Amino acid sequence: MGISSNGYSDDLGWNWRFGVWNQELTQTKSGYKGDHYQGEFASRLARTAWYDEASGGRGYIHLALSSSFGVPDGNSPTNNQARYRTRPEARTDSRWLDTGRIAGADRNSVFGFESVVNVGGFSWTSEYLQTKVERQPAFGPNVTFKGLYTQFAYVLTGEHHPWDRKTGTLGRLKPFENFFMVRDCDGCRQKGMGAWEVAFRYSHEDLNDDKEVTENNG
């Protein structure tokens, strides 16, 4: 449950969104533990620094900052807990990285930076996130985790990834031709290559904190 707002500037150069929520109870989902009130504030400010109108948006640069602040607000005898775990992009069965339970989580915050550069069929996307868990003094020092990814891609068949300047998000790539053999609106079979793209992606996540937490490999 919550309330949020979003908007964009008249020239579509800026867009933003922010909101306040009462986070869902997550005791059974390996998240924060506590009573029903778990407030969170989240925001994102994005800038389309360049957009090539002449080519229909085949070139653009996007930059954005994001943040969120949460208060688990647990109650005795169940002390607040936090846990961070994840799978790789291949979506393996097990989660490769897992902090385990972090006791005494009093507040949490996330700060992020993201960027997208697109020129024709070439695109470069990247994002960096830093998460801090503030703990009750009796349970130990605060802990910080970091993660990032960067990806280079090229569309071999000439399409591009469109950009939505009102929301600051990537749109769906639309192939120039349907793939292989499909029927058109007249019922005739048409041949096409579809859309083909090659990509290289590097991602890194550090769920260790020298002061307290050592990640568990699944």
Where do the model's predicted regions map?
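Outer-membrane beta-barrel pore domains
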Residues: G59, S67, S76-G218
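Short loop/turn segments at secondary-structure transitions that flank enzyme active sites
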Residues: D11, E24, Y51, V71, ...
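A residue-level signal for beta-strand positions that form part of recognition/binding surfaces
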Residues: G2, N15, A42, Y60-H62, ...
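Extended catalytic-interface subdomain
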Residues: F18-V20, G59-V71
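Surface-exposed coil loops of outer-membrane beta-barrel proteins
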Residues: M1-A46, W50-S55, D73-A105, D184-C185
